[in-house]
Amino acid sequence: MTSLFTQEIRLSKRHEKIVSQRLMLLQQMENKPEDQNKGRASQTQAAKAALQRNVSLLKDIEAAEKSLQTRMYPALPPEVAALETLYWASVEEYIPKWEQFLLGRAPYPACSENGNEAEDTIPKRAQQ
């Protein structure tokens, strides 16, 4: 009988231990969503802060790039800018004439009487 009584006490203690572990696990399960929400909130806040920092850094980099470009490539004098505009207009005008030749589909484009079509056109445009 003593052995049954001892066994009963041992089982009772084990039961209490299991019940206390269960209670502890239930409390952890209840606290886990709260902890996860806190973790998500802190992650969201950190992500927003990182985004603001990145936007600020990007603006600083763009400003530095613009500053360097103006130092490296100052504005052209108006005469040079006008010549550049005339040059690119001339190039765009002659592209269709030369395109087929460059692709190997047509003969060399015919030039003006003196042999250089560009020499005739550029002074005329500069006078306009």
Swiss-Prot record:
Key words of the record: Cell projection
Domain of life: Eukaryota
GO cellular component: cilium
Compartments, record wording: Cell projection, Cilium
Pfam families, A to Z: CEP15-like
Annotated function: May play a role in ciliary assembly.
Name listed for the protein in its UniProt record: Centrosomal protein 15
